[in-house]
């Protein structure tokens, strides 16, 4: 449940940044990508960045340019809410997080997440 709430909030922050942050709009301009963040059990959300805007979907999580697949929702929540970049690297190393698809899109999305400021909640 916490993981679903985190994904919802993340989607809202991405949408808000795409509308209100000049630097974020500049970062996503011209990028057309579909990123899925989900658990190994298949619960998650797709983040679609297209034409300078962000939309989200909770269905059709099989199609993605890149996917971040967490071993479970509790681990994902713990790592993502920590705000610690090293925790993401540790999760990858420990196989608690798997990346699928285009690795460049995976890194681009993590960079986009890093550009979200706390004021954009």
What do these predicted regions represent?
Residues 1-121:
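Feature captures hydrophobic
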